[in-house]
Amino acid sequence: MTNNLSGYRNKIVRVKTAKKRPISSSNWLRRQLNDPYVAKARLEGFRSRAAYKLLEIHDKFRLFTPNMKIVDLGAAPGGWSQVASKLIKASDNNLNNKIISIDLLKIEPIVGVEFLQKDFFEKDTEELIIHGLDGKADLVMSDMASNTIGHKATDHIRTLLLCEQAFEFALKVLKPSCHFIAKIFRGGAETALLNKVKREFRTVKHFKPVSSRSESTEIYLVALNKK
């Protein structure tokens, strides 16, 4: 995987603020139109720029191998599930090589991916995931984030709570010596969660992919080898 973006950087596109469009929406649209990773994802067939973040995480930590069972939390629009499907060489008829993806929003089919259009926090979701796995998972990955409101402390806490829920779920479904990755936003309140994770995994790292926007406080928690 390369982060060479030559050929994907376009002239700056300027967006006029429509009378009924909030300034924040115009800023988001401008950022999307001028983001080389958005252009690269479109040309290379990935559903989101987040695919490159997972590719970078894999390049650094070598998480994916054939014959894995993976849970993808907050999967829409499917960029991470796409990457995982390619890296484990998933197929629809190999039950030992599968991905269970969950999101409230629908995603289009991906080879080797069983999609549950569910709220992760509903009582029966966990049971459905475990049934779909038909055993324990080799990797739980979460790119879940709360809807941001522009208040960094609030956004930090909300996404941290999602990460904590994903971590508690991972402890239930992961095999020993297997892995957990999740998005968090830096903000100071993550220390308690990190200490919990360190008690349950042999190696815990922070990683900020190059493809993560420089102005974003997001980083990825990479927890390796569950005890």
From Swiss-Prot:
Q: Does the keyword rRNA processing apply?
A: yes
Residues given in the record as S-adenosyl-L-methionine binding sites: G78, W80, D103, D119, D143
Keyword Transferase belongs to the record: yes
Role this protein plays:
Specifically methylates the uridine in position 2552 of 23S rRNA at the 2'-O position of the ribose in the fully assembled 50S ribosomal subunit.
According to its UniProt record, which protein family does this protein belong to?
A: Belongs to the class I-like SAM-binding methyltransferase superfamily. RNA methyltransferase RlmE family.
Q: Where is the active site?
A: K183 (proton acceptor)
Q: What Gene3D superfamilies does the entry give?
A: Vaccinia Virus protein VP39
Q: Where in the cell is it found?
A: Cytoplasm
One GO cellular-component annotation of the UniProt record comes to: cytoplasm
Identify the keywords attached in UniProt to this record, alphabetized: Cytoplasm, Methyltransferase, rRNA processing, S-adenosyl-L-methionine, Transferase
What molecular function terms (GO) are annotated for this protein? rRNA (uridine-2'-O-)-methyltransferase activity
Reactions it catalyzes: uridine(2552) in 23S rRNA + S-adenosyl-L-methionine = 2'-O-methyluridine(2552) in 23S rRNA + S-adenosyl-L-homocysteine + H(+)
What name does this protein carry?
Answer: Ribosomal RNA large subunit methyltransferase E
Q: Which residues cross the membrane?
A: none
